[in-house]
Amino acid sequence: MTTKTSCGDFVQFFRSWVSDPLRVAAVAPSGERLARLMTQEIEPLDGPILELGPGTGVFTRALLTRGIPESALTLVEFGEEFAVRLRGRFPEARVVQMDAAQLGQCGLFEDAPFGAVISGLPLLSMSPAKIEAIVGGAFETMKPGGAFYQFTYGPRCPISRSILESLGLKGTRIGGTVRNIPPAGVYRISRQNPLEISTGGSKYRRAEDNTGIGAYATEAGKADMGRPEASA
């Protein structure tokens, strides 16, 4: 299965960027080389896998190429236009339309912990409180040894040292590519002590409550829970 981006995907992505540049934060979908970097450490036994901000599904296809069953994927996407296409393109995956900042509060992911999280979210365009809510919530849904993979267009880890330390996490750069628009680096975020579950939950919940973000989750057949500010 190829991870190359079709012309139709590019057009949809570009239109979404034009309509909401802060939410999409890139003029084109991620490239094939970046998709390989983002998923290079993922193995079939790591499932189930959570993907945040999958957009047109570039990283999703790379996960399938790595041998992850489609049924083991949960795709969290805020944009309705992307969520609709993802449901049609990956019918066996669980597609949830929601703000990723609500991961630790929505109660949708308590049935089985994830082995890893792949994030295509534009963290550089988000507030520190929102980043902490997303990352903290993601680690609440993960197995103790799970890792959070994030790419960035910046020169350093997009999650600040203060946020990492408050959640008991560490960031490690695992690669980069100039063959992407724009060039990007990839970081693995993991627990400082894999045997301990992050204890930062109450802190990041309070931070997000102060920003007035409400819960929002729409899955095929599920009702709205209130619309938040834009994220993925």
Language-model-derived ranges and their functions:
Residues 10-17, 40, 161-232:
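SAM/dcSAM-binding transferase cores
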Residues 6-44:
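Class I SAM-dependent methyltransferase Rossmann-like catalytic core
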Residues 132-144:
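A short glycine-rich, Lys/Arg-flanked "PGG" loop and its adjoining helix->strand segment in the class I
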Residues 142-153:
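Conserved beta-strand signature within the Rossmann-like core of class I S-adenosyl-L-methionine
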Residues 46-55:
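Conserved class I S-adenosyl-L-methionine
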Residues 79:
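Conserved SAM/SAH-binding beta-strand->alpha-helix loop
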Residues 57-61:
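Glycine-rich SAM-binding Motif I of class I
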Residues 106-117:
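A short acidic, Gly/Pro-enriched loop at the edge of an enzyme's catalytic core
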